[in-house]
Amino acid sequence: LTIVGTGYVGLVTGACFAEFGYSVTCVDKDDKRLEMLKSGKCPFFEPGMDELLDKHINKTKLITFESTIKNNLDNTDIIFITVGTPTRRLEDEADLSFVWQVAEEIAENIKKYCLVVTKSTVPVGTTRVVQKIISNKIDQKLFDVVSNPEFLREGSAINDFIRPDRVVIGTENKKSENIMK
C-alpha cells in the first residue's frame, strides 16, 4: 500500500494498515517531517501512535517513508490520497490543489493496475475529477478511483480506524469494491 500524505489521516491510515499486516510506504514531500518519522517520532499527539510507529518502523519494518511516489508504484496495488485540503480564506471552500498534484503524479508513474483511493476530506465530485486527471494521461484499464472518506476523531483515531462504526466506499465497479473489502 502507498499512502500519499503523512498528516493526521495519512499516518493513522498507514500505521493501522501496518497493524493489520500490510506493507505500507508513506510518501511526503516535507523532508523534515520524513526525518522525524523515520526516527519513529510522530509529529502530532495521538494515543498509541508512537507505539504503533515504533513497532512497524523498527521491529516489523512494515512502514517505510519516501519523498516521492515515483519509485513506489511498481510494488503497490492501492494508493491512498491523504493530503491536506485546507480551506481557502476568501472563498470558504477546500483548496484541492494538493489532491490534483498527486493525481498528476500518479498518472505519470502508473505502470500496472492500481486502485486510487481518495481519503482526504473533499467535496462531492472530487473523485470524478481525479479520475479525469489520471485518464487524460493513461489507459483507464490501469486504474480505478474510489472514495473512502475517513471518520477519525482526534484522541481515538486508531480505535476509530480499527473498529469503525461505519465504512463508506464510493465506487463504480465490482472490481474496486472487492479490493476495498
Please give the residue ranges for each predicted region:
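NAD(P)+-binding Rossmann beta1-loop-alpha1 motif at the extreme N-terminus of oxidoreductases
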Residues: 1-42
